[in-house]
Amino acid sequence: MSPQTETKTSVGFKAGVKDYKLTYYTPDYETKPTDILAAFRVTPQPGVPPEEAGAAVAAESSTGTWTTVWTDGLTSLDRYKGRCYHIERVFGEKDQYIAYVAYPLDLFEEGSVTNMFTSIVGNVFGFKALRALRLEDLRIPPAYTKTFQGPPHGIQVERDKLNKYGRPLLGCTIKPKLGLSAKNYGRAVYECLRGGLDFTKDDENVNSQPFMRWRDRFLFCAEAIYKSQAETGEIKGHYLNATAGTCEEMLRRACFAKELGVPIIMHDYLTGGFTANTSLAHFCRENGLLLHIHRAMHAVIDRQKNHGIHFRVLAKALRLSGGDHIHAGTVVGKLEGEREITLGFVDLLRDNFVEKDRSRGIYFTQDWVSLPGVLPVASGGIHVWHMPALTDIFGDDSVLQFGGGTLGHPWGNAPGAVANRVALEACVQARNEGLNLAQDGNSIIRQASKWSPELAAACEVWKEIQFNFKSVDTLDLNEIK
């Protein structure tokens, strides 16, 4: 028995229940550069002080339990415990607080998003003392970031592989998402790629169903890729969804994609799980495959403002786990996404260093220490009239993905792709010439449509389509000030 242990046990064990705040609320604590920092939106039960609620979160997500235990004396709680070091009221919300918690790095397994999430959010969200709890942000310290591979390749390597620079990349999700035979599916892929798109995509729930087994889909899509490349002289790709019921089957599908020589595959990282995703990201790095990530199931976790996990946290977790693309909303389309919040986590995906900025929902300064960046994918209810806004909002390092906005063209799939490519090239040229895309966007599209009948037809079809709904997840009043 060590002298330290002897000293602790000799004091004697006092059983019972004590307030969490006596041990885990430490307002004088100075955070360390190696700490993982978390910002929780806490809604306590009536009668529970915010300090007790914040301390309970720190305790239950680190070393604490509901009662004092004898084995507390066999370790150093001061070394391993989480600490609630600051609490602030959320203005404009009744009984809501932001509780800041610091976790020592030794609590977490190196290179494991699974372990990090199991610790921080694995159990505490069901705690009875809280009416609701939401993880708003995490600060991942460089010491922990360096234990992860991260994205298989990153933005610059992807551009070099594709030999495409100076503009956003264009994609399309094949529709209908379910029901097509593999041959008809491959035909749609070919027509879209031939028309000018860089990528086409499996939808998130396209795996290996009776109407289209995965191997058949992979073969017909590979044929479409090679045929369109030969005709256009451009490198093309299709996001072949390797998501499967087991990790072994997922990697088997990824291996087959590698044998076909295609440039990119896909994974549903939340439904597939972080362990599977990290394994697939390592495989892609080793075998030269790009990895597209779909965030299916994210809104179950992140949409409600007072409970769950904000998508900026899921985005950071994906950058650690690994992916070269990830869906990030559109701001202007059919899916949830306020502009400033979206731009905040888009920067967290792409940039090496992001300053704290509460006006964009960023609670902590994040240093990625050269971990490769991830391309945000704008997808969901977008069409050619949205192109100026999308180009302005997301910039060059992004993928703009039009499903119905390509395949819904009245003349067919290839003309739909042509319309999108013409609209994009017109917006990029106008921006480079100094025009303001936000102000002049509609006139830019109208001018381009005069010499592109495909674009003119698309403009006519979607001229009145809008999705005018307010976002559920918005900035707090104190963040807007």
Swiss-Prot record:
Sites annotated Transition state stabilizer: 334
Record's catalysed reaction(s): 2 (2R)-3-phosphoglycerate + 2 H(+) = D-ribulose 1,5-bisphosphate + CO2 + H2O; D-ribulose 1,5-bisphosphate + O2 = 2-phosphoglycolate + (2R)-3-phosphoglycerate + 2 H(+)
Compartment list: Plastid
InterPro entries (UniProt xref): RuBisCO, RuBisCo_large_chain_AS, RuBisCO_lsu_C, RuBisCO_lsu_C_sf, RuBisCO_lsu_fd_N, RuBisCO_lsu_N_sf, RuBisCO_lsuI
Residues where Mg(2+) binds: 201, 203-204
Binding locations of substrate: 123, 173, 177, 295, 327, 379
GO MF annotation: an example: ribulose-bisphosphate carboxylase activity
Keywords assigned by UniProt, alphabetized: Acetylation, Calvin cycle, Carbon dioxide fixation, Disulfide bond, Lyase, Magnesium, Metal-binding, Methylation, Monooxygenase, Oxidoreductase, Photorespiration, Photosynthesis, Plastid
Cofactor binding note from Swiss-Prot or TrEMBL: Binds 1 Mg(2+) ion per subunit.
Propiece residue ranges: 1-2
Residues where N6-carboxylysine is found: 201
Residue numbers carrying N6,N6,N6-trimethyllysine: 14
Miscellaneous field: The basic functional RuBisCO is composed of a large chain homodimer in a 'head-to-tail' conformation. In form I RuBisCO this homodimer is arranged in a barrel-like tetramer with the small subunits forming a tetrameric 'cap' on each end of the 'barrel'.
NCBIfam families cross-referenced by the UniProt entry: PRK04208.1
Function: RuBisCO catalyzes two reactions: the carboxylation of D-ribulose 1,5-bisphosphate, the primary event in carbon dioxide fixation, as well as the oxidative fragmentation of the pentose substrate in the photorespiration process. Both reactions occur simultaneously and in competition at the same active site.
Protein's recorded name: Ribulose bisphosphate carboxylase large chain
Native source organism of the sequence: Cuscuta gronovii (Common dodder)
Gene name as annotated: rbcL
